[in-house]
A protein has these predicted regions:
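Predominant activation on well-ordered alpha-helical scaffold segments within soluble catalytic domains
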Residues: 6, 29, 99-102, 106, ...
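Residue-level marker for buried hydrophobic side chains located in beta-strands
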Residues: 60-62, 143, 170
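Short coil/turn motifs at secondary-structure junctions
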Residues: 67-69, 120-122, 170, 234-236
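Solvent-exposed alpha-helices and their adjacent loops that cap or buttress functional pockets
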Residues: 55, 79-80, 93, 133-137, ...
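Metal-dependent amide/peptide-bond hydrolase catalytic core
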Residues: 3, 10-17, 41-43, 147-148, ...
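Acidic/His- and Gly-rich active-site-bordering loop/insert found
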Residues: 1-91
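Acidic/histidine-rich catalytic neighborhood of metal-dependent amide-processing enzymes
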Residues: 90, 94-162
Length: 248
């Protein structure tokens, strides 16, 4: 299993790189043929590859993903084992979960069980969401092979909302006539503290400003600024509360 996990980890697969995601499913299928004795089907869902092994109408679904966060080349070496701890991009989330699920499929009735691996989970499952929801409604059980930080059984997870806020200002020369400009950077910075105030630690709701970009040159009043926001919560009520506040 470790050798198979190593092969997957050393095949880097950031969500944004379609060729890399296709390659990691190819590697996964090579491992599948060795472990199961047959290959999975690679289907296309809104232009993205999805690995599907087993029934198209399963009673039980083992749900995984093989895309990762980090851009190619972010880690060296890609694979390291120290004692009983393996490290590398995707080891924890969630290539090890895929390998465990694949080995669990040995000896199972593939007419009743399916193992699915998507390639857009780290960016919100925008293209695979419909597929996941449809197959989940039909199945008796869906087991998501996501690890937890302390090794306990994960029985739920937060929903995620992503926002991008854009401010349009007015450009002007920062030295000659700054008073004629409207500074988009200043205006968007006023929003940050208001966003942070929306979090609710007791209910587990987080609102995190992440990427902010603004300006064009060092001597120009910024005419445009944007801010990305990552919000997560356990309930739809909290997600709606945050959304309403942001849109207000």
């Amino acid at each position: 299993m470790l050798k198979d996990l190593q092969a997957l980890v050393e095949c880097e697969s950031p969500s944004s790189d379609l060729a890399a995601c296709a390659k990691v499913l190819e590697v996964a299928n090579q491992i599948t043929a060795k472990v199961i004795g047959t290959s999975a089907e690679i289907i296309q869902e809104s232009g993205r590859p999805v690995y599907w092994l087993g029934s198209k109408n399963p009673e039980v679904v083992l749900l995984t993903h093989l895309d990762t966060v980090w851009p190619i080349g972010s880690f060296a070496p890609l694979w390291r084992v120290d004692g009983d701890v393996a490290s590398g991009p995707g080891v924890f989330d969630m290539k090890s979960g895929f390998i465990q699920a694949l080995y669990a499929m040995r000896g199972q009735d593939l007419d009743r069980v399916a193992l699915i691996a998507t390639t857009d989970e780290e960016t919100g499952s925008a293209t695979s969401r419909k597929l996941i929801e449809e197959i989940s409604k039909k199945a008796k059980a869906v087991l998501v092979m996501e690890a937890s930080l302390d090794g306990k059984l994960k029985i739920g997870r937060k929903g995620t909302s992503m926002y991008q806020i854009t401010i349009h200002g007015r450009a002007a020369h920062a030295g000659l006539e700054p008073e004629k400009g409207i500074n988009a950077t200043v205006e968007i910075s006023k929003i940050v503290s208001k966003l942070i105030a929306l979090e609710n630690k007791e209910l587990g709701t987080s609102v995190v400003p992440t990427v902010m970009t603004s300006g064009s040159t060092t001597n120009t009043v910024p005419a445009l600024a944007s801010l990305d926001v990552d919000s997560r919560s356990f309930t739809m009520a909290e997600m709606k509360r945050v959304e309403q506040a942001i849109r207000a």
